A protein has these predicted regions:
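Conserved beta-loop-beta element that borders a ligand/cofactor-binding pocket
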Residues: 192, 244-272
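N-terminal Rossmann NAD(P)H-binding glycine-rich loop of SDR-like oxidoreductase domains
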Residues: 66-94
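Glycine/proline-rich active-site loop of Rossmann-fold NAD(P)-dependent oxidoreductases
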Residues: 254-258, 270-287, 326-338
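Mid/C-terminal beta-alpha module of Rossmann-like enzyme folds, strongest
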Residues: 309, 321-378, 410-415, 419-421
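NAD(P)H-binding glycine-rich loop region in Rossmannoid oxidoreductase-like domains
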Residues: 83, 103-170
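Conserved C-terminal active-site "lid" loop/helix of NAD(P)H-dependent oxidoreductases
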Residues: 316, 377-399
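Alpha-helical substrate-binding/gating segment
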Residues: 288-338
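Conserved Rossmann-fold NAD(P)-dependent oxidoreductase catalytic core, especially the SDR/UDP-sugar
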Residues: 149, 158-237, 261
Length: 421
């Protein structure tokens, strides 16, 4: 009997030791997992975002959105591209949260509010937001299934190249933080730039979505590197666009609840919705200058840039539609990039060819600008670049495009209708 009791006691002791070892192992395992998760969290991340669980298991379940999934928010909604995005979404029946800096600025928002009175299936609601303020988009993004980020507070005209670069990161980080806090966003489509794509190549080289501005460093004589960001605005702007693209893709991958897709437009032209869209130094602005009889690159008899260039043109309405299709298409995935440029060679013109086309489309305008000519030929040879086409957007997103003739004609007609010529 005593031996039996001793065996029972021995078995219980062994069991307790086993349980203690198992508990110690489980505790160590969870501690290791916790430490691993903490190491992945980015420095300076908001406290409320630190505790938010990653859902990478959702990655295979993510697909495009539809209007039944909820509203779509548009940043930079009053801008040239953003306004067309809002219009396109409303045509498709979406409820749009239009984010603008000042909802009381009638000059910038009236054309948006007028969309509510055009019999479109969708609707629009304005939200006041500022890219440079943390949390400014939280309210606008609540309940949204998609975000189309067209807003940009910085460009070439900041005081220093470093401000261009740093500012681009700051504003995009604020927007991404609001996306994560919303918790309902499936697709985040944002306007990048062809500047994030282009780099020195031989004349006639055709750029694709596989190209990045940091490629072919030797072609820049080693200048186009991150070490030179603080010294050159062009480098700062292009590298900011490329590196924020990569930052956004990484943020979406780590979060696991939404996918990020970029649209990289080249020379965007097309009809203006408001005279506010005649933005100084924009491509549509220079079309207006040509129609006023000024050679390309000139403004009020001042030469702002060289008059020779290969124009690679895309309609602003096609750019807008590509943003919306990026939120919907099952073919687009996190990290997908889509160049929005000419559909084919017809949309690529040297300045003198563009002048000839405008003369054909607007015979009533006596003097149309172009570039300096000698005996009917361009005085200077133009470097044959950038060549690129929106083939991938057509193939994967199902984008259909305007003809270059329709785009140019309707651009000029809008300038006339708005009394800008």
């Amino acid at each position: 009997m005593a031996m039996f009791e001793n065996n029972i006691i021995w078995i219980l002791l062994v069991g307790l030791v086993g349980i203690w070892i198992s508990l110690d192992f489980i505790q160590a395992m969870f501690s290791s997992i916790k430490e691993g998760k903490e190491e992945k969290q980015e420095e300076g991340q908001e406290e409320e975002l630190e505790d938010r669980p990653s859902s990478n298991d959702n990655r295979d379940k993510l697909t495009g959105i539809s209007k039944s999934d909820g509203p779509v928010a548009v940043t930079g909604a009053s801008g040239y591209i953003g306004s067309r995005v809002v219009e396109d979404l409303m045509h498709q029946g979406y409820q749009v949260h239009a984010c603008v800096r000042d909802v009381s600025n009638e000059k910038k928002v009236d054309h948006l509010l007028n969309l509510n009175h055009q019999g479109l299936e969708g609707g629009i609601e304005l939200y006041e937001s500022d890219l440079l303020e943390k949390g400014s988009y939280d309210k606008a993004f609540e309940g949204c299934s998609g975000i189309i980020h067209c807003g940009a507070a910085l460009g070439f005209n900041r005081e220093t190249p470093q401000e261009v670069y740093d500012g681009c990161f700051t504003q995009n980080e604020h927007v991404i933080e609001s996306v994560k806090r919303a918790g309902t966003v499936k697709r985040f489509v944002f306007t990048s730039s062809f500047a994030a794509v282009g780099h020195p190549r031989p004349e006639g080289y055709v750029f694709t979505e596989k190209d990045w501005c940091g490629d072919n460093v030797e072609g820049y004589g080693g200048a186009w590197t991150e070490e030179n960001i603080s010294k050159n605005r062009d480098i700062a702007y292009a590298m900011a666009k490329a590196n924020t693209e990569k930052m956004i893709y990484k943020a979406a991958e780590e979060d696991g609840n939404f996918e990020a897709i970029s649209i990289n437009p080249l020379h965007v032209i097309g009809p203006l919705m408001s005279d506010n869209h005649n933005q100084f130094f924009s491509w549509q602005f220079f079309i207006g200058q040509l129609l006023k009889g000024l050679d390309f690159g000139y403004w009020k008899e001042r030469q702002l840039r060289g008059s020779t260039m290969l124009w690679n043109m895309v309609d602003v309405r096609d750019v807008a539609r590509a943003h919306r299709l990026g939120t919907e298409s099952p073919n687009a995935k996190n990290g997908s990039r889509y160049i929005l440029s000419a559909t084919d060679r017809s949309g690529e013109m040297f300045t003198w060819e563009l002048q000839a086309k405008l003369k054909e489309l607007f015979p009533e305008i006596e003097n149309i600008g172009g570039e300096e000519m000698e005996e009917g030929k361009p005085k200077e040879k133009t470097y044959d670049s950038p060549r690129s086409y929106c083939s991938l957007a057509i193939e994967e997103l199902g984008l259909s495009t305007y003809s270059i003739e329709d785009t140019l004609k309707e651009t000029g007609d809008s300038y006339k209708a708005l009394n800008l010529l």
